[in-house]
Amino acid sequence: TFSEDGKGTNKLANAELADKYGIVMGTSHHEPLCRAGVEWQNKYRQYGTSNAWDFNTNETAITKFWEDGVARNKNFENVYTLGMRGESDSSLSGTKEENIALLKKVITAQKDILKKNNLSDAPQVLTVYKEVEDYWHGTDKAEGLKKWDVLNDVTIMLCDDNFGNMRTLPTK
């Protein structure tokens, strides 16, 4: 990952240089709290025995993984990605209602991590791309993330469908 791609003994050299030049760092829509998906598969043994990228079954290990990402990058200016997708940027495995509840649990945990690191006021983003669009809008049985007040201080990035067609538009 960029934050650890520095040469020699200083693995944070790239992040330090970016910070020196005033570059605000962030990660993609499927790399929460400064942690890349490939990092998880390379480092999961530091956090437990399961490599499952599944917050339902591996919450403790994934939370610690995110905590370490924030600890590593908190001295630099970042935009913190919130949310979670399935392995390799896929959809989550539950029903829409289950996944809405899961994402609310995930985002609450992520915001708690930021708060513990005095980063509650740091910029945060939730990207509403195709894997999470249904959870944004919700269903007849479960209110989506769109009206969830926990996200009032989070930038919501609305995306196209890879062909230039907007999937969701702002209402205000």
Predicted regions and their residues:
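Feature activates predominantly on carbohydrate-active enzymes
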Residues: 1-65, 74-80, 150, 155-158, ...
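Gly/Pro-rich turn-and-neighbor structural signature
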Residues: 59-172
